[in-house]
Amino acid sequence: MEGVFCPLLFAYCLLPTFNLKERLESMLIIGELINCTRKKVGAAAAARDVEFFKEIACKQVNAGADMLDVNGGLPGQELEVLPWLVNIVQETVSVPICLDSADPEALRRALPLCKQRAMINSITNEPARIAALLPVLKEFRPKVIALCMGEAGPPNTTEERLANASHLVDLLTSEGFALDDIYVDGCVLPVSTTPEHGKALLDAVGQITARYPGVHASAGVSNVSFGLPLRKLLNETFAVLLMARGLDAGIVDPCDAQLMANIRAAEALLGRDEYCANYLRAFREGKLELPTAA
């Protein structure tokens, strides 16, 4: 079946009661595939398979990634693996890097290697993590993903997400970070365990972007589908729902052609693609022509 964009989803998303932040900028696509917590990727990192990572970096950028998330989380090896991965990625592609680590020493080793301003994924509203990461953030001044998780663990409600977001935004701005450098991640959790997780995040994203004009909203979209069949279908749908609430950065699989086509269509329909330039470019490049089933 040909990939289609569902107008009913947009009708739901754009009800007048929703407080949608008006933006013109397109989505920041952060490629998620260089993640050593994934079995195949971790094995390639353990074997120091340079060609594997060159290929996966190129594939993501060619598919439309604006930035690459790099997770070097091999047990006991992150201090060596993260800088190694940064060097490989930068030798291969020219996009900035999002360093996916909570280890301050690993970040201290990797950040000076970044040729462009990096992003850190992520700081949370946990005192121990703040104490560990804040000195590194202040020294190197990267862009920052502020994950709405506190000492009690992952948030269950919209209100918990808002409380964590407020504390983190206030903390970072008090330390001199511009709102434009802060990407609030409302914490995507699987709907397979708690069906309300999806709606709670949607409401939180809308309220965060309304409360803090200038702050970006990001999400690790694929977490929502964990434990369910046809994960790509859920990821593709959820990304569009989030965009209608104000999401402007996503850690996603850019090699998912349907997801990327949906994002380009959503940008055009939400007024975030001036003169539909990105949509038309994707059309000319054949990126909207999805395979059809026999």
Spans of model-derived segments:
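Short polybasic linear motifs
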Residues: 8, 15
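Extended, intrinsically disordered, low-complexity segments
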Residues: 27-43, 51-55, 61-63, 252-294
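Catalytic alpha/beta core domains of metabolic enzymes, predominantly
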Residues: 132, 140-277, 283-284
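Active-site mouth loops of central-metabolism enzymes
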Residues: 30-55, 121-124, 151-159, 224-232
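Catalytic beta/alpha-barrel core
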Residues: 69-74, 95-103, 118-128
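Glycine-rich, proline-tolerant flexible connector loops at the mouths of alpha/beta enzymes
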Residues: 61-95, 188-198
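Alpha-helix-loop-beta-strand connector modules within alpha/beta enzyme cores
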Residues: 78-115, 202-217
